A protein has these predicted regions:
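Nucleotide/phosphate-binding sheet-loop regions of phosphoryl- and nucleotidyl-transfer enzymes
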Residues: 1-171
Length: 171
């Protein structure tokens, strides 16, 4: 019975789109088997896992930890390119047309790409994912876009933000 959570800002005043969020935290190779058993829907689970890898690699690994890809393109764009390659190879136009097996394969492609491009493996450990996501949300308080938004909206810097960790609800 895996516990998946979202990690979001709990700023005193809402700052729409300014603060980072990470969804599906806690989904690992081990926990996804329990989620497949619980939902009976492997495609849903593999899609949630690949989305976590993409979001985490971008928000936590690249942005928060400051790891920059050597070739210039951000990790999110590179992972989206891998998705496009797979859709083309399978002769489909939409993400939803990929099968559970396609998405399972894409997860491994994503993990390999993250390791190659960022030089660090995607954490297949729920606690590491959680602490990384929490740090990223706190860090997003001081991004250029968040600081600029606070200036425009007269939100004091010293207010800071909280981090909300909430159980994921799908439906």
């Amino acid at each position: 019975n895996p516990l998946l959570v979202s990690v979001r800002s709990g700023a005193r005043k809402s700052m729409p789109g300014m603060m980072d969020t990470v969804l599906n935290v806690g989904l690992t190779t081990k926990t996804r088997e329990g989620l497949i058993e619980k939902t009976g829907n492997p495609r849903f689970v593999y899609d949630a896992h690949r989305r976590l890898i993409q979001m985490y690699a971008d928000v936590v690994m690249e942005q928060e930890q400051g790891i920059r890809p050597a070739d210039g393109d951000g990790i999110r764009e590179q992972l989206e390119a891998e998705m496009s390659k797979m859709k083309k190879a399978r002769g489909v136009e939409n993400d939803v047309d990929l099968t559970a097996d396609d998405l399972k394969e894409l997860i491994e492609i994503y993990k390999n790409k993250v390791k190659k491009v960022l030089g660090v493996a995607f954490p297949d450990d729920a606690k590491k994912q959680l602490w990384g996501a929490i740090a990223a949300v706190f860090h997003s308080w001081n991004t250029k876009r968040a600081v600029a938004y606070r200036r425009i909206e007269n939100i004091p810097d010293e207010w800071g933000t909280a981090v909300n960790v909430q159980t994921m609800v799908f439906g």
